[in-house]
Amino acid sequence: MTLMLTLGTAVFGAQKTLPSGKDTGSINVTNLKPGDTVTAYQFVKADYNEYGFTGYSAINNYVKDPVAPTAQEVIDMASSAATMTVAAEKKVATGDTEVTLNGLPVGYYLVMVTSGSETVYSPMIAGIYYSKSATDNTLTNGAISADSDFEIKAQKCWAK
């Protein structure tokens, strides 16, 4: 009887950590060249209340739909990136081909790469987001391959 009560307490006593504004994640950008500089600008943030995560909202109206930016919105943000707040920036070290931007709040980011060589990169987007249910603070971190094509709402885009 004692063993059953102890096991029951362990199972029922475990509590999930609710999503909160303190949650952070990372964006990993691969297939870069040494000397490239990766800069991330947050354009969508996560919203919370006392019960946890409530959804996403656009920062400064950069996008109409926070979870479905259009290709034109990405182009417009890239054109005005100089006016946006830098969330993180990191230079690719000699001998490396990737960078990881850590400690970023949950949300979506415009990622720009300034080339240290002759490579030209197009603007990219990445997200740090909760699971669909958002019942705990488990995050999916952003990942971008800088030399891959991608689509936004079925419109072809190119990473470089």
Could you say what each language-model-derived stretch is?
Residues 28-34:
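Structural motif
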